[in-house]
Design a protein with these regions (language model features):
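N-terminal presequence-like segments and the immediate start of the first folded domain
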Residues: 1-95, 100-200
């Protein structure tokens, strides 16, 4: 009984600075592991000192390559963090949240019923495929800004490690590459849904 409680007790996971994951200044852990569950804190492309990490800062932050560079930085850190928990980002990730910075819609556009953020996430999705082959249940939201200056992307995840097979339901969304639902053992994970016709 005591051994079982040790396995399920929450454990903070720090992959270590040698893994290349910057240590955040905020009072939280990069990951918490409890039983087979792993909860990953949101990752940004930041050095947690100056804002956007200098290694990916570009002259024109509006270029699509900027989002791809941030995606590679963020997903690489997530993969290292998840590996430190004993899980695999592709095999064990069951749910993902993605936050993109956009100045749209404006208040006027929103009042007119237009809530499209006006950004292409294709560079992010292209990079994500290098780390995650599956199309996981997900949520994608646009925000005016993130906590660290000049960052345009934040991603957080849940992983679940057990011996069960992963079963997905429905066809992947053609734009965001996520499935409506995923089942792992007794657990079912759903994508967020909105009143959008993705066939247009």
């Amino acid at each position: 009984m005591e051994e079982d409680s040790k396995k399920t007790a929450p454990e903070a996971i720090w992959p270590g600075l040698e893994a290349g994951v910057p240590k955040p200044l905020m009072p939280y852990s990069p990951a918490i592991k409890a039983g087979g569950w792993v909860f990953i804190a949101g990752q940004l492309a930041s050095d947690f000192k100056t804002g956007l990490d200098p290694s990916i800062r570009q002259v024109n932050p509006f270029l699509k390559e900027q989002l791809a560079s941030e995606a590679d930085f963020v997903l690489g850190n997530l993969a290292d963090t998840i590996k430190a928990t004993g899980c695999d980002i592709d095999k064990d990730m069951v749910r993902i949240w993605q936050w993109f910075v956009s100045s749209r819609p404006t208040y006027k556009e929103f009042e007119q019923g237009n809530n499209w953020p006006g950004i292409s996430v294709a560079p992010y999705i292209s990079v994500r495929k290098n780390y995650i082959d599956q199309c996981p249940p997900s949520s994608s939201l646009s925000v005016r800004e993130l906590m660290w200056r000049d960052t345009n992307l934040e991603v957080d995840m849940i992983c679940f490690a057990d011996d069960n097979e992963t079963t997905t339901f429905g066809d992947p969304n053609p734009h965001m590459q996520h499935v409506p639902a995923l089942r792992r053992g007794d657990w079912v994970f759903l994508s967020s849904e909105g009143p959008v016709d993705w066939t247009d």
